[in-house]
Regions:
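Membrane-interface helix-boundary motifs at transmembrane edges
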Residues: 2-5, 53-63, 127-139, 191-203, ...
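Functionally critical transmembrane alpha-helices in membrane proteins and complexes, commonly lining
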Residues: 6-53, 68-77
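Aromatic-anchored segments of alpha-helical transmembrane domains
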Residues: 17-24, 76, 144-159, 207-221, ...
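Hydrophobic alpha-helical segments with transmembrane-like composition
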Residues: 31-34, 83-87, 91-196
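Transmembrane alpha-helical segments and their boundary/interface "anchor" motifs
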Residues: 35-39, 52-109, 115-120, 207, ...
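Membrane-embedded alpha-helical segments of multi-pass membrane proteins
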Residues: 36-44, 111-122, 174-187, 233-246, ...
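Alpha-helical transmembrane segments and terminal signal-anchor/GPI-anchor hydrophobic tails
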Residues: 196-267, 272
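C-terminal "closing" transmembrane helix and its immediate cytosolic amphipathic cap
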Residues: 254-273, 278-333
Length: 333
């Protein structure tokens, strides 16, 4: 059994930090720069799955779905119960339903990321088989086809929206998510263990493709820098390319940044990103009075989220020793 790669946990820590940074409203330039957050998390997931065998697909899909969805549902139950007792906060039925369906629209607005992980996870057995069967040229061609499919799908969405929001969001939050976010995951699968020259070649080609896309966008719109605000919802090829490139750069900088992955605090955060992410959701709202002071707000949200999860973990372990129950594992990890 392969030992846990601490640098992958470091990448997840960086990805989670970038997601939190987006939610505290940093300056526009920084908001755009850090927009590789979710692609980086998918890239790290691909690295973690690289080289693994799935003996039973049904068992894999069931256990992984429970590991992703159960903590989120437990959190949402507690979250909406807490909101119910707040006099100035009225909970709408569509907000509750949308949140439990992990939607981006008509929900609390942060749980769509979990749906991305869930959808990509459901496709993981297929992507693992493809990664093993395709040689480098075939794999590169498949990536290009996926990028084109993401763009064509985005154009299709523009035509679907006037026809009805139900169909639009159903397609947008399933097919478009899978097509787009599978790309960084596939890169993670492919480049966990490769020789340095192949990694450098892939990085160069990815950067070249990104440069071409930026030039095309600039020629068309006169502005190629607002990737997140223009091309993230729904995800388009330019946004996914930037996220994958940034993730690849961080992975290639392992020798330089590897020392950070050995810090116990970062390793702990990287192993427990889900619950820390969930705890940050109410804290984003609670820290809104800080206004434009995004850096103190980020530090406060991060530290309190981590502290709340640490308390939760200690309490769950204490209860487990006295009253073991299978549900407690989802409050722990």
């Amino acid at each position: 059994m392969r030992s846990r790669d601490e640098y992958i946990d470091f990448l997840k820590f960086v990805g989670l930090t970038m997601i939190m940074l987006a939610h505290v409203h940093p300056p526009v330039w920084l908001y755009e720069l850090r927009s590789f957050d979710v692609p980086l998390m998918l890239f790290a997931s691909g690295l973690a799955f690289s080289g693994k065998q799935i003996d039973s697909q049904i068992h894999f899909l069931c256990t992984r779905t429970l590991r992703l969805v159960t903590p989120v549902y437990l959190f949402l139950i507690g979250y909406f119960i807490a909101l119910w007792f707040l006099p100035d906060r009225h909970v709408q039925a569509d907000e509750v339903v949308g949140s439990f369906l992990l939607l981006n629209a008509h929900s609390i607005g942060y749980v769509w990321v979990i749906k991305v992980f869930l959808l990509v996870m459901l496709c993981t057995p297929v992507m693992l088989r493809l990664d093993r069967k395709l040689n480098d040229r075939q794999w590169s061609a498949a990536i290009l086809v996926l990028l084109v499919a993401v763009e064509l799908s985005g154009l299709l969405l523009a035509h679907l929206k006037p026809g009805g929001l139900a169909v639009y969001y159903a397609y947008y939050e399933t097919v478009q998510f899978v097509l787009a976010y599978s790309i960084p995951f596939l890169f993670g699968l492919r480049f966990h263990v490769v020789e340095r020259r192949r990694k450098q070649t892939a990085l160069f080609l990815l950067a070249l493709l990104m440069a071409v896309v930026l030039l095309v966008l600039y020629a068309q719109t006169g502005d190629a820098l607002h990737l997140s605000t223009r091309y993230k919802f729904p995800p388009r090829a330019a946004f996914i390319l930037w996220g994958t490139l940034a993730a690849f750069i961080l992975w290639s900088a392992r020798r330089m940044l590897g020392i950070l992955s050995r810090l116990r605090l970062i390793a702990f955060c990287g192993r427990h990103t889900l619950w820390i992410y969930l705890w940050h959701i109410p804290l984003v709202s609670l820290t809104r009075p800080l206004g434009d002071h995004w850096l103190p707000r980020l530090v406060l949200v991060w530290c309190v989220s981590l502290a709340l999860y640490a308390v939760q973990l200690s309490l769950v372990k204490w209860v487990e020793r006295r009253h073991p129950h299978p549900l407690l594992r989802y409050l722990r990890d």
